[in-house]
Amino acid sequence: MQELIKRAKELLADGTVVRVLGWKAGDLAFNPEPAYFETPESLEDFVYDGFCGANLSKYMIEASKLEGKTMVCLKPCDTYSFNQLLKEHRVDREKAYIVGVGCKGKLDIEKIRKMGIKGIRGISGAEITGDAETLTVDTVYGEKTCAYKDAMLERCHVCKGKEHKIYDELIGESKETKDADRFAEVERIEAMSPEEKFAFWQSELSKCIRCNACRNVCPACSC
C-alpha cells in the first residue's frame, strides 16, 4: 500500500493528475469507502486492503465530468467494467490515469460473522502485500482466526482472472483465487422446472425493497 500512496503523491505533485480516486479508512477496520484525495496530505487516510472490494470504475462516470485527470485504482475485475463504460462513451479515457492494483481476493465481513466470530474490533492478515493465508480477528472475546479463502467474496471464487485489461501502470502483485465454476449457479437454475424457476424468482424478488443497491453495485448498469 505504501508504494501506491508514494506513487499517488508523485502524480499529484508533478501535475499529472489533480485528484486520486481510491479508498479511505471507515469507522471500522472492515468498511473502507471510496474517496477522492486532492492533496498529498489527504493521502494519509488512503487504504487498500482485502476489504476494498468496491469497484471504482463507475465513480469515473462523474469524475470524467470534472476538470483535470483523475488517478483511479482499479483491480483486475474492475478493468472489465471500465472497458464496458468506455465502449458506451460514459467515461473519458483521457480523464483517467489508471493504476492497476494487485488483488488476492476481497473479503466478506458477513462470512466472517457467520463463522460465529462476533464483537469484531480489528482484523490483521487482510493486507495486500505478503502471503498470509489466515486472518487474525481481534474481538471483545479475544483473538479468533479463520482462513483467508473461507472469508472471500463469492465473486472472487469465480474470478475471471488477474490480468488487468486496461491500465497506465501496474502496482502490486495478484494471486489467482478461482476455485469454482462461474456458471454453476446459472446451470442449476436452468435445470429447474418452470414451476421451480417461478418459485425461485418469486422468493428472490420478494426481498426487494427498491433500495437500488442492485443498480449501485452493478459494474456497468446500462440496462
Question: Model segments located where?
Answer:
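Short, intrinsically disordered, charge-balanced linker/junction segments flanking boundaries
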Residues: 221-223
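Iron-sulfur-associated redox domains of electron-transfer enzymes in respiratory
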Residues: 1-201, 219
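Residues immediately within or flanking Cys/His clusters that coordinate Zn2+
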Residues: 153-156, 205-211, 215
